[in-house]
Amino acid sequence: MKVILASASQRRQELLIRLCDNFDIIVSDFDEEKVVFENSIDEYVQNIALGKAMDIKEKIKEDAIIISADTIVTLDDKILGKPKDEEDAFNMIKLLQGRSHKVYSGVVVINTKKDLIIKNSVATEVVFSKMNDDEIRKYIKTKEPLDKAGAYGIQGIGGIFVEEIRGCYYNVVGLPLNKLKTMLEEAI
C-alpha cells in the first residue's frame, strides 16, 4: 500500500527513510491555528498532527498509509513553536539557555483502507547549556533556528548547546522513530 508523509519537513523525510524506503510526500494545508490548546500538551500536538493527516485523507482517492507529525517545545508550561523572526528566535533561545525543557511530538498514522486512525505522542526532556547573547546571535545568523520549534536544531549546530537529553533523540529532531515503527506495525 502507498505510504504518504504529510510534511514538508526535510528532517522528517530523512528520518522516515529509515523505516520506509518508498513514500510520497503530500504537504498538508491544514491551519494549525485552528487547534485550540485546552489542558493537555499531548492532546494538542496529537490534534495538530491529526488535522494534517485528515487534510491529506480528504485530498487523496486511493488507499494509503498517511503519516503526519507536529513538534513543539515547552518551557514552564509555555508553548514555543517556530519563531516568527530572528528576534523571536533570540528570545526563545534566551529562555531555554541554562535550563531544562520538553519537546513533544504528536504522531498520527491513518490506514485509509481499514479506516484506522492511530494517535500518539512522545515527550523528551532536553537540558540546554548556558549561552551568552553573542553566542545566541551567532547561532541565529546561521538561519538554522528559524524553521524549528523552540528555535534550535539538535541535529545541527544547535546540538552543541545541548548538555543532556532524556528520551527519544529522534523526537527532538521531529519524528520519534521507535514510536512510529510500532504505530506502523499496528496500522498494517
Swiss-Prot record:
<feature type="site" description="Important for substrate specificity">
    <location>
        <position position="155"/>
    </location>
</feature>
<protein>
    <recommendedName>
        <fullName>dTTP/UTP pyrophosphatase</fullName>
        <ecNumber>3.6.1.9</ecNumber>
    </recommendedName>
</protein>
<feature type="active site" description="Proton acceptor">
    <location>
        <position position="70"/>
    </location>
</feature>
<keyword id="KW-0546">Nucleotide metabolism</keyword>
<dbReference type="GO" id="GO:0009117">
    <property type="term" value="P:nucleotide metabolic process"/>
</dbReference>
<comment type="function">
    <text>Nucleoside triphosphate pyrophosphatase that hydrolyzes dTTP and UTP. May have a dual role in cell division arrest and in preventing the incorporation of modified nucleotides into cellular nucleic acids.</text>
</comment>
<dbReference type="GO" id="GO:0036218">
    <property type="term" value="F:dTTP diphosphatase activity"/>
</dbReference>
<feature type="site" description="Important for substrate specificity">
    <location>
        <position position="71"/>
    </location>
</feature>
<dbReference type="InterPro" id="IPR029001">
    <property type="entry name" value="ITPase-like_fam"/>
</dbReference>
<keyword id="KW-0378">Hydrolase</keyword>
<keyword id="KW-0963">Cytoplasm</keyword>
<comment type="similarity">
    <text>Belongs to the Maf family. YhdE subfamily.</text>
</comment>
<dbReference type="GO" id="GO:0036221">
    <property type="term" value="F:UTP diphosphatase activity"/>
</dbReference>
<dbReference type="InterPro" id="IPR003697">
    <property type="entry name" value="Maf-like"/>
</dbReference>
<feature type="site" description="Important for substrate specificity">
    <location>
        <position position="11"/>
    </location>
</feature>
<dbReference type="Pfam" id="PF02545">
    <property type="entry name" value="Maf"/>
</dbReference>
<dbReference type="GO" id="GO:0005737">
    <property type="term" value="C:cytoplasm"/>
</dbReference>
